Every structure is written in structure tokens, then in C-alpha cells.
Amino acid sequence: MSGPVVVLAGGTGGAKLARGMLDVVGSDSLVVIANTADDIEIYGAYVSPDTDLVTFWLTDRIDERGWGIAGDTFHVMDGLRAIHVDVWFNLGDQDLAIGLERARRLQEGERLTEAHTAISKALNAPATVLPMCDEPVRTRVRTQDRWWPFQEYMIRAGGAAAGGDPVQDVDFRGARTARPTPEVLHAIAAAQAIVIGPSNPVISIAPILAVNGMRQALTDATARIIAVSPLVAEAVVKGPTAAFMEFAGLPVSNDGIAAYYDGLIDGLVADRRTHGLPALETDVLMDTPTARRRVAEETLGFALALR
């Protein structure tokens, strides 16, 4: 096969698909473009949750909870609580170390891409994981009372899926002035297939697409673009996808996913067919390594068959 398979990822669904795709195409043929609009600077660290999540999945470090590093300790968080610091964002010690090193590199003038590449190499990541851009882009959520930074909305305010204040608006501050990195543009142009992972379309994939020039780069690509639905039996497996789709005026269904990506994708992988779009009907629940590999393999085959 020529050219990489490019996966757009944010959150657990995209990371799982990336891990399955690694088994299918190998380390030299996989590039993951990760959402960085969830990034947060806290405790002196620069934390990039989605970028790190993908890296932890690819290196088989992911904790069974679905976030953080397996076997990590929380001594620093315990120490902060002991001196009455408001620890609302929980980070394991190894996870924090990565964020501190990223912050150090950024303070010394490295691009976000350069900083994460160095960290990925140190962790022996077997594929390329690229931030969507080097400039800061931040997701904000507006409720009735105020605008919230995304992490604060999800954790402190409870998030819509957990009974928190309903979403009234979402924006991606900085996206209009940000640009895809040269590395991202090269990967997209060279790709043999581009896959939008089964991530929350409104808050995980939309920030990537909102970066100025990203959608045009994808449109100009010669590769077919396939989205994998995050829904199983027309329902959300976990997380706030339903709440954000409802905010966006979309039905929580595969037709809603197809409508959201209308004009961008060439096909949809889902467990129930949609109308008016080439679709591959298959089980998209990726709860085992075998399932992750199967979904990745079938998705890639579908993309290549549409060329």
C-alpha cells in the first residue's frame, strides 16, 4: 500500500480505532491527527488529553478506566490536596510528568507538534500522532449562565450527559487564526485513505475541522474520506455525544452523523444503514482487540473500494 492511513481522532472512540488500525497497517503507515481543543494548562503542566489518549492506546499504556496510564499513582494530587489546592482535574504522576515536559518544551520555543513528537519518541509510540495545529484552539461551552472552558464544563459543571446545565452554544476559540501544520497537510495530501474516528462529532471532530484550512485540505485530498459512526444500535455507548448532537439540531442516529459530515465524507461505517450515502453495515462496537482490528480492517477496505 502507498501513502499513510490518516485517522482523525478525539476521545476514546477515535483512539480505539487508531489502535485497531495500527494492527492492520503497521507503524509506518498510520498517522493520527488529534484534537487539541481540549488542551488545558494546569498545575504548571500543559495537558493534551486527546493527543495523549491516542498515544497511550498506541503504546498499550491505557488504563482500564479509559483514560490515564495503567498502574499510575496519584501522589502529587494527594500532596496538592494536603496543602488545600483545589484538585478538580485529576492527573496521575506519570501523566503529569508528560504534561510538565510538554510545558517545558513549549516554554523553550518548540512547536506543539515538536513537543509531542519528542514525547512520543520517548514513549516508543509505534505510529505518528500529530496535533491538529500548533496554535492554541480551545473549546468553550455556553450554558444559561456563562461560557465554560470545555474541561471545566465537563468536570466541574457536570456536563450535559451527567445532568449538568444544558448546552446553549459551543465555539472553538482561536480556530479561525490557526492553521494545519505542515506535517498535517503533508499527511492528508499523501494519504491513501482518511478515516474520521467514531468520536463525538460536535466536540471532538468539529474542532479539527474548524481549523482554518483543514476542511479545504481534506476536500482537496485524493483519498476517500470515511467516517465511522460513534453510535451502536442508534445509541451512544458512553459520554456526552447525544447531548451535543441534540444541541446541534441533529437526530441521535446514523442519519444524523451522515448529515453532520455531509459534503465532506464519501461513506459511513455503521451498524445500521443510512440513506443517500455509501455505507458499510457492520458491528462498530470496539470492546476487544479483535473487534478493533476488524472494524479498522473493514473500514480501510471500504475506503479503498470506493476509489
Question: PLM features: residue spans?
Answer:
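Electropositive, gly/pro-rich neighborhoods at or near active sites that engage anionic ligands
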Residues: 34-172
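An anion/phosphate-binding loop that grips the pyrophosphate of nucleotide cofactors and donors
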Residues: 191-192
